[in-house]
Amino acid sequence: MDKKHILCFLVLLPLNMALISAESEEGVNQTDLGVTRNKIMTAQYECYQKIMQDPIQQAEGLYCNRTWDGWLCWNDVAAGTESMQYCPDYFQDFDPSEKVTKICDQDGHWFRHPDSNRTWTNYTLCNNSTHEKVKTALNLFYLTIIGHGLSIASLIISLIIFFYFKSLSCQRITLHKNLFFSFICNSIVTIIHLTAVANNQALVATNPVSCKVSQFIHLYLMGCNYFWMLCEGVYLHTLIVVAVFAEKQHLMWYYFLGWGFPLLPACIHAIARSLYYNDNCWISSDTHLLYIIHGPICAALLVNLFFLLNIVRVLITKLKVTHQVESNLYMKAVRATLILVPLLGIEFVLFPWRPEGKVAEEVYDYVMHILMHFQGLLVATIFCFFNGEVQAILRRNWNQYKIQFGNGFSHSDALRSASYTVSTISDMQGYSHDCPTEHLNGKSIQDIENVALKSENMYDLVM
């Protein structure tokens, strides 16, 4: 293509792109084909500008001239060499991490395919493993939806239990309720965001305000999850380490930390994104502005890690004071740690880096998706379904139901069931000490002894 044709193209292409933009502003829906065409035309325009502006090759010897092959722009290349660059992102089945190659023959001409006798660029690697990657991506997508769906169902059941049984009401249960509610909201918004926004390429390309608001809410609620986790850690640390005999804690500060503080990084990110990287519905991760969101979350995780280690240290010390068998003491400390690990989000500390290799990357993706998107189910299981007092209350109400409607149980069977329930409640003192006695102020020696043993019994929830 000579300079005259290039100049003509440079004049006509902006007019064509302006017409496409005008159609978008008038409300004409852009299809995937229209988005792809716009990307290719933009790349072609930039390529021809580069061809015109770059200085002429002054090196001696034969070389292939700079050119546009229809999808990518190629610089001058010395004869007998192979040029290489990454695959374009025009098509959904193209992998931008793969490479495109173009060969310059020994005579200084671009390689021609023997079948068509036309210049040819090797794009075969761009979609070589597309089928497998699409299959993996779909599996991860369905895994994400299933994880959030199970999380929503389990968290709603947990909230019904906590609200229905008034005997479970206490400050820590209140924190649990807020934590559960933040996970429910985040799961709902995540499902909507993935199905309605992230999968709609035309919507993402038009970059409307509605999808930016959706991304803002998604990032805010994600922050709420981690900061309500931090609230749980702060509460436990205050209760067990800082002030065992403290009066009732003020929950207002926990509400501010859990619901209020995440608004700050979310708003700062929204302002910065609108000013410096206002594209693709703010979904693109190719920007350092995401550190505005991830920085406070990482800080919350590190603080919670400190709380975890300090709580375990105090628990081991207190368990030694009780003069129990050493193996039993450390077993309870390990179990307490296992309860706190998912609460504090240690999975991001254990898996901070993405490994190299096809199999390793796939395993990493599955593990991270399970850890991230099944968190709600995990939290509901640990703090509700494995809660000893919740199990005792449900068992007691079930036994009362069977006695009331007389499902063939004798009077002695009913008495034995009631006796077993009472003994179970006496044994399961995890939340019994956590709720009614958490506000003691050293009124009696027996009360003080009970509170001293509270940290040991608090984690007898999974026995």
From Swiss-Prot:
Compartments (UniProt record): Cell membrane
Cystine crosslinks: C47-C73, C64-C104, C87-C126
Predominant subcellular localization, coarse grouping: membrane
Sugar-modified residues: N29, N65, N117, N122, N127, N128
Signal peptide: 1-22
Record field: transmembrane: 139-163, 175-197, 209-237, 252-272, 289-313, 329-350, 366-386
CC per GO annotation: adrenomedullin receptor complex; CGRP receptor complex; endoplasmic reticulum; endosome; lysosome
Residue ranges, Cytoplasmic side: 164-174, 238-251, 314-328, 387-463
Site (Required for ADM interaction): Q201, M372
Assembly notes: Heterodimer of CALCRL and RAMP1; the receptor complex functions as CGRP receptor. Heterodimer of CALCRL and RAMP2 or CALCRL and RAMP3; the complexes function as adrenomedullin receptor.
Protein name, UniProt field: Calcitonin gene-related peptide type 1 receptor
UniProt source species: Mus musculus
